[in-house]
Amino acid sequence: MNFETVIGLEVHVELNTNSKIFSPTSAHFGNDQNANTNVIDWSFPGVLPVLNKGVVDAGIKAALALNMDIHKKMHFDRKNYFYPDNPKAYQISQFDEPIGYNGWIEVELEDGTTKKIGIERAHLEEDAGKNTHGTDGYSYVDLNRQGVPLIEIVSEADMRSPEEAYAYLTALKEVIQYAGISDVKMEEGSMRVDANISLRPYGQEKFGTKTELKNLNSFSNVRKGLEYEVQRQAEILRSGGQIRQETRRYDEANKATILMRVKEGAADYRYFPEPDLPLFEISDEWIEEMRTELPEFPKERRARYVSDLGLSDYDASQLTANKVTSDFFEKAVALGGDAKQVSNWLQGEVAQFLNAEGKTLEQIELTPENLVEMITIIEDGTISSKIAKKVFVHLAKNGGGAREYVEKAGMVQISDPAILIPIIHQVFADNEAAVADFKSGKRNADKAFTGFLMKATKGQANPQVALKLLAQELAKLKEN
């Protein structure tokens, strides 16, 4: 029997506000343990939460970006559970009235087709702290993350393969990043994914029993974990067994999913309205204000890059996959840089450098200004493409102006015939054997002089001018 795969994803995104959702403490990542905490995060008796308006702003933007309806009358709820990283023994979240509902996002699949994936809801909530289990037998709790604002985006069970789940996450990450509400860095925990997967016989409308997957720390592992579950569940069903509703984690080392616990249901959390936060209303004016702050999204940028700038669909997709790269490209083109040349550099030398250094574009000294200046001095013949690669590395590490560096470093290309012709004559004088081979008609003997000339000029001879002059002087040499 063949089975249809049914997948839904729950994505937690940390919102990039300066302070936490219910306390004035910093929400920034990377500080010392428990440095970003106060009495609200510690749940001291008598302290009360105060809602951060910036979190609601971000929630509205997310809902608009994901084509969602917005609940204009909102409240928060308590989700009750005990764990050491949750000192209140409950989490403030949204249960029956999330900020956004009934949305969708269009994704592009590997075969070039598109599919619309429904989004059931997006709700605001606070993050929990972090437990670390030491080798000394003690467990340690860091509450820096406690109270960091989250939006949980819950898809419909519309995905029918791990490939579609991967495409959905890629599209969702782009939209959230462009909306400016999160950096969506999985390595820092600002984007976390749980997957729900079940199988059912083709033609059956009722969903099968689902399994939840956790510990999916990359899009690649989401795909691998889902692929493993498809095989595991299919084998159980074909052998006459039944799937249990359970939570499993993906073990990257063994490339398998491992049982964590039997899955709880919503009733286990005993949700009830949060009494310390009153009901509040989101006005139409507030929604429209947030709408005006939304930028052009990846899909629209890609279309513009193709229609207005003449880029290929592939180049447009690569450039818009990351907002930082796309914004860099936008500024470089606005400064007069040739769109195709800027695109080639960003996808070629710049991407290779970032991969080798393990850095992002924001972490190096390259700017749209000095990249455009470098492209300009390539085009006007000041430097060759070969020398430009060395210039780029300097700019990426040290910044500054491209032309100024080239002139100070003595890298300016030699294009003046009055300088090159005497050097060519000296090359002839220094390589008498090669001259003799050329005059005797030895095959490809002329090719050697190109290398001799570039060596004599330390690679600074303008290749086009130098080859033309070399051919001219070799012709004269043959006549004599």
From Swiss-Prot:
Q: What class of enzyme is it?
A: ligase
Tell me one GO molecular function of this protein.
glutaminyl-tRNA synthase (glutamine-hydrolyzing) activity
Q: Which PROSITE patterns match?
A: GATB
Gene3D superfamilies attached to this UniProt entry: 1.10.10.410, GatB domain, N-terminal subdomain
The keyword Kinase is annotated on this UniProt entry: no
Say which domain of life the source belongs to. Bacteria
Residues folding into a coiled coil are none
Q: Where are the transmembrane segments?
A: none
Its job: Allows the formation of correctly charged Asn-tRNA(Asn) or Gln-tRNA(Gln) through the transamidation of misacylated Asp-tRNA(Asn) or Glu-tRNA(Gln) in organisms which lack either or both of asparaginyl-tRNA or glutaminyl-tRNA synthetases. The reaction takes place in the presence of glutamine and ATP through an activated phospho-Asp-tRNA(Asn) or phospho-Glu-tRNA(Gln).
The Swiss-Prot or TrEMBL record describes its family as follows: Belongs to the GatB/GatE family. GatB subfamily.
Official protein name in the record: Aspartyl/glutamyl-tRNA(Asn/Gln) amidotransferase subunit B
The source organism is Streptococcus pneumoniae (strain Hungary19A-6)
Classification from the root reads:
Bacteria, Bacillati, Bacillota, Bacilli, Lactobacillales
